[in-house]
Structure formats: structure tokens, C-alpha cells
Amino acid sequence: MKRLVIGICVIGAVVVGVVVRAQGSSTPARDFIPVTDAMLAKPDPGDWLMWRRTLDSWGYSPLDQINTGNVTQLTQVWSHEMGPGRAESTPLVHSGIMFIPNAGDFIQAVDARTGESIWEYKRQLPQGVGPAANRAIAIWGTTIIDASSDNMMYAIDARTGQLAWQTPVFDPKVRASAGSGPLIANGKVFTGRQCLPDGGIDTCVITAHDAKTGKELWRTRTIPKPGEPGDETWGNVPVEQRWHVGTWMVPSYDVETNRVIIGTSVTIPAPKYILGGNDKKHLYHNSTLALDADTGKIVWYYQHLVDHWDLDHPFERLLVDTAVAPDPREVTWINPKLRPGERRKVITGIPGKTGVVYTLDRQTGEFLWARPTVFQNVIQKIDGATGEVIVDPKQTFNAVGDERLVCPGTNGGKNWPAGAYSPQTNTMYYPLQNMCMTAVSNTDQRDPTKVYGLTTKYVMTPGADKVGTVWAISAETGKMVWKYEQRSGMMPLVSTGGGLIFVGDAEGKFLALDEKTGKVLWQTKLPDSISGYPIAYAVDGKEYVAVSTGTSLVGNAAAQMTPEIKTDRKPRMYVFALR
């Protein structure tokens, strides 16, 4: 296939290039249907229009052509080479086109039926700016919208790959990239940021941009300045030393309340004795935030953990309407005011690395219940009446050189590999790791190997020999429905209307589990480690399942626990369908 360079443009200090592969008149790009806000709110069953497919972050496809009865007939139908770097990506599918995000602001458009290339877009980054991982892109109108490694919000034409607009958020060389990409609702592009110390407090923000023009609409900081609400929770820590409350995963959006629901990360340094004292809350780290989508105002917050160990809580929040009847035989912490069986609009799931499931009232942030999954030793108790989380004081640090065995470790437990929710079973499904770490307190936060004030080493959870596990947990009762375990680490998963859970692992296995029992119904072994988010989509009435391989932070860490398992990590998209 001949490669044609059709556009080079210089904007400020950024050079943007587009490489397009020539296509015939039948290319799906010519028949592209613009994506509306209504389509994002209620996607066509065959489409995958955003990170977790829907604004409520379910990670659920209603497609059922591939199901428990015929999944054994699944076979690979095409694959497509991806770009270099961490391949932690989620492909989008619309109008018969698959859009594949790659590390370093490289986006590919391919025919979703065949894998044939349509166009490729590659940003030329300024000197000194490294390529960031790109877990998600967004689609609106006729544009693909993303957050770049050099701190731009930008849009490209979904039909041609040409740049449509771009808007600077910060200086290109400040380490405050988005990490996971945007979510779009009601014409607004919502994006969080990771924010390392060199950027200062003003890079720890959530932003909203106009999807049509790229104009910034608002930005909200996640660390208060003196005189602002929450300032007192930092004690006497000067504002220039308040670092790194990031929002490095994709938010959810509550249509009914017009609120952005997003999670936050740890501070830098993590040990709080270095940061004003172990008794301080340091808002809004490791919290769920509900923001007014029109103004960015924080409506409410709930803090999941005062974090001394880099156990971030930025992961997907599932927005679910369900009866709430936590079973005290399995659910450790329950709000005593809760009336069992009452129907509530909740935020649920595993928001942080601890692997603890939290269920909150979606409108107020009220704590309803919580339970652990994999072994954890950092939370001592949660006050059911107030929702206050009490950490085990024996696990905190008090001086340089203090060493602790911390479970889970910074790899989780839970990490960016997303879980899913199935409305068919009212059950949530989560890929987790049985991993802990030894952690020694240090003080040199400017050293990139010690940036969180910790020197760490991964170890297996005591008594465990299987790294990877998938937990199925009832959204109503909190009971474990089933648990699947295996030697290699688990990667993201997706649930489908066919009663299936598709999940990959660090070894390269791609599995289909029965959503009701956890039984393995089908599996295939790919040449490389699974690294991306699987999706299900349909074109011309035919259902497909896609997943990418390559290198990833979670997969690489899990592999340290299984040195006997050898696998490559070449980035590639694989697509399957029924024979």
C-alpha cells in the first residue's frame, strides 16, 4: 500500500505531520456519520465510542452474537501492527472504522472489518518531551479528540487524520500529561492530569474544553491554596511543596446530575510524616470528586484513604442504579443507617490500588458499604456512620529508613486495567493482582527513582502463588459470586450481552469466562503479552472482539513475579470473530 504524506503544518513550536495510506472509493471514511451528544449518551450497540463504551464506565457491550453457546468457534480474523511504546490502549469503533491510540500521540485508523489501514496521524513532539502512554481517545462530531504528551488538547478529522484544532494546557515540557485521555459529554471534553513536582500545584487540574473549538471552559485544581476549602488539611506545608494529587484516569459522567465523577492519586511524597504529619488529610488526594460539569465546582468529595504508600485511587467509577443490601457475612464495613434492599443511585467498584470495593451514594457521596478483595493490610477500619477510613498506624512511616511490608503494592491489587459491570447479572468483574511490596521511607523526591518518598520492591502476597485473579462481586449484596485465579497477572476485561467476560493476561492468553460461573469457555495464546483494553463491536451485522498486545507497566510488574513465564511484548491489535 502506497504511503502519501498529505499535510505538514507548523503551529508555534510544534510540528504536526499526517501520514495517510491511499484507499479506494469504498473506504469507510467516506461514509463517516458524525457522532452527536445523544449518540454518546446512548451508543449504538455495535459502536465503541469512548474508553469504557458508556458514560457510566460499565465496560459492557450489549452484543450477543458471540455467546456462551458458540464462543468456542471464535477465531482470529485480522491483526494490525501498532506503534512503539507502551500499548495500554482502547480502540474506538464507529462507522466501520477502528481508531487505535498509540503511545506518543500516534493514532491509526483502520477498516474495522479487515484491519486495512485508512490513515495514520503522528505528532512531532518538541525536543525533550517523551512519548506518554495513551490509554484512551474520544470522538465527537467528525473529530477524534485527545490529550497530547506535550500538554495540548487537540482534535483531528476522523475521516482524513488532518489536524482540526489544538489548545495548549501547560508549557509543553512540564510533566503534566493526561495519561489516559478525555471523556466527552454535552459538547465538553473532560480531562484529568498527572502532575509531578516540577509543574507545581497549578498543574494538578481537571479541565473542560469545548469539543467543537478546543476553547478551555474551566479548570479545577485538586490541591487547595491558602484560604481555600481544604487548605487546613495540609497543615503548615507551604503551597510550593504541595505536590501531585493527580487525576490520571478517565472520568465518568452522571447524565442525571450533570456531574463529572473522577478519582485522584497520592501526594508526593507519599509518607505523610514528611508532609506536615501523619494526622493530616491532605485533600483532595485519593478521593472521589463530583464536579459540576458546567462550572468545574467540586460539589462533594469522599476520601478513600490517607495514603502513605502510593496506593492511588484514580480508577473507573461505575455508575449504577441498584438495590443495596450488603451481606454482613462478607461485607466488612456497612453504613448503619442503610435500609437493606432500598434502591439507590450509586457509585461503586474498586477505585484504588487497595482492591477495596466502595459503594457511595451518587448524589451526595454518602458512604454505603465497602469490602476488601485481595489481601490488604493498610486499612484498619472504616467508620460505617461517617465513612471515615482509618489506616493501620503500624503500617505508616515515622522516620527515614522505616521499612514496611505493604499489601497490595503500588502495582495493585487494582490498577489501570479496568473492570466491568454487567446489567444482566448486576455484578461487577475486576482483574486484580496478588502482589505486595517492601517499602522503605526516603526523602529525595527529586530523584526519579524515589519520587514518592519510597524505595520499593514487589513481592508476592504472603501465602499466594498465583499472581492474577478475577473477582465477580454482586453490586447489590457485595458478596463474591466467583473468583478465578491463575499464575500470570491479569489485564483489562470487558463484559458482553452474550454472557461472557473477555480478559487477557501478562503471558499473552486471551480468555472468555462465563459471567455467571467464572468457568473458562475459550482461550487462545497470542505471541505477546496482552496490554490493552478489550472491546466488542459490530460492523454489517457481524460481531468482533478486539484486544492489543505489547508492553505495559502492570504487565511488566506482574511478570517479575513469574520469571518462568517467557513472552514477547510487540505492540499489535488482534481481532476475533466467529468462524
What are these regions (language model features)?
Residues 7-17:
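Bacterial N-terminal signal peptides
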Residues 24-76, 222-229, 391-395, 459-460, ...:
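Blade/loop signatures of beta-propeller domains
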Residues 48-52, 84-106, 129-153, 177-206, ...:
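Repeat-blade elements of multi-bladed beta-propeller folds
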Residues 63-73, 102-124, 283, 293-296:
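Beta-propeller domains
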Residues 80-92, 120-141, 163-181, 221-250, ...:
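Extracytoplasmic beta-rich repeat domains
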Residues 112-114, 135-169, 174-222, 357-368:
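Hydrophobic or amphipathic alpha-helical targeting/insertion segments
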Residues 156-161, 203-216, 277-296, 359-365, ...:
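Beta-propeller blade signature
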Residues 535-579:
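Blade-level signature of beta-propeller repeat domains, shared across WD40, Kelch, NHL, RCC1
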